Amino acid sequence: RDWLLLIGGSTYKFTLTGFYLVALVAILKNHGYSLNQLSWIHLIGGIEAAKVLFAALMERRPAGRFGRFRGWLLAATLGLSAVFGLMACTDITQNFPLLLACCVLLSAMSAVYGCAMLGLSCIVLPHRERGFGGVIQTMAARGGKMIGGALVLWLYQEYGQTAAAGFMLAFSLLMLLQLLCYREPDSPTAQGSWTALAARLVSFWWRPETGWRWLVLLFAVAA
């Protein structure tokens, strides 16, 4: 059940990415949106950069009745389901302010979902299995981007905007059902202040097995 949730959750996360960055932009372009308007969509997508803050908040929040990360996953999936439900019932392409509001929610909830799923994978997978877990997540990322980008666009081309949004809604509800049936294992609450967290982040790159050269490599790959 743990592996099933990690595979499904990782696929869903990158399906959201493919939908937002590929399908949604292509659909809006087809509706006559200008490059200036589309730039706002990508700018709002920068909310994902706040993941570091979301992750720190999740680590320090005591586990509640839904678990440390499962509660965040449930809340994010509910929010995403509401947005996709609105998209399926309303033509938001004709209302730019409403579209921007939906994009803010999509980006924010997607960031929360991604952080919570990564945190859950860290407490579910033993240290020796995290390498294999990374491979699974990479494969799920490839598949998710194809689903969110290519498949959703095909549905839009063949059956219209309602069908494309309806597919994303159905996928969200399926993940919500999976989360409702899942029970998160116990995990300790992270200790230390925000200052200690910043110190750990800096010291991590001074370790022999990491080092600043790997940080430079990461930035080079990202660029």
Task: Tell me what each language-model feature is.
Residues L106-A141:
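Cytoplasmic helix-loop-helix junction between adjacent transmembrane helices
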Residues I47-K51, G131-Y156:
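Glycine-rich segments within core transmembrane alpha-helices of 12-TM secondary carriers
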Residues A75-A82, T162-C181:
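Symmetry-related core transmembrane helices of the 12-TM Major Facilitator Superfamily/SLC fold
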Residues D186-A223:
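Juxtamembrane intracellular "pre-TM" segments in multi-pass secondary transporters
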Residues T11, V83-L86, Q94-Y113:
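Hydrophobic core of transmembrane alpha-helices in multi-pass small-molecule transporters
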Residues R1-E48, W212-A223:
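Helix-loop boundary and gating motifs at the non-cytosolic
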Residues A56-P62, M87-A88, M146-A164:
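Transmembrane alpha-helix termini and helix-breaking/packing motifs in multi-pass membrane transporters
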Residues L73-T93:
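C-terminal ends and interior cores of transmembrane alpha-helices
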